[in-house]
Amino acid sequence: MQLNIKGLGVAMVTPFAEGGSIDFDGLTSLTNYLIDGGIDYLVVQGTTGESATMNLKEKQDVLEHVKKINAGRLPLVFGHGGNNTAALVEGFKDFNWVGVDAILSASPYYNKPTQEGIYQHYKA
C-alpha cells in the first residue's frame, strides 16, 4: 500500500503540566484545534514534540492519546529517531504501530555517522 501524505502537516508540541507530567487535557485540546483548523495530517513526536526529553512510555502514551482523539480523521505521522540505533530498535519493537500512517525518522545527528552508517541505521 502506498500512502500519499501531502498538504499541511503540523509537528505537534507536547504540553506539560506544572509538575512535568504530560498535560493530556491540553493535548486533547491541541489535537482537536489542529484538526478543526483544517490541517491535512498530524506529526506526533516530531521536531517540537519534546521526544528527546521523554521516556518510551511517555512517547507511547502521547501517541495513543492522539490516536484516540484523532480517531482516524487525519493521517498520523510519528517521529522516531535518535542517535542510539540499537536502543531505538529495541525500544520500539513492541510499540503499537496500529494507526500510525508514516514515520518521520531523523538521521543520527550527534555522532555524525558516515553514509554507510546512516544506511545501516535505517536498515536496522
Residues of each region from the PLM?
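Active-site beta->alpha loop and helix N-cap motifs at the rims of alpha/beta catalytic domains
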Residues: 2-124
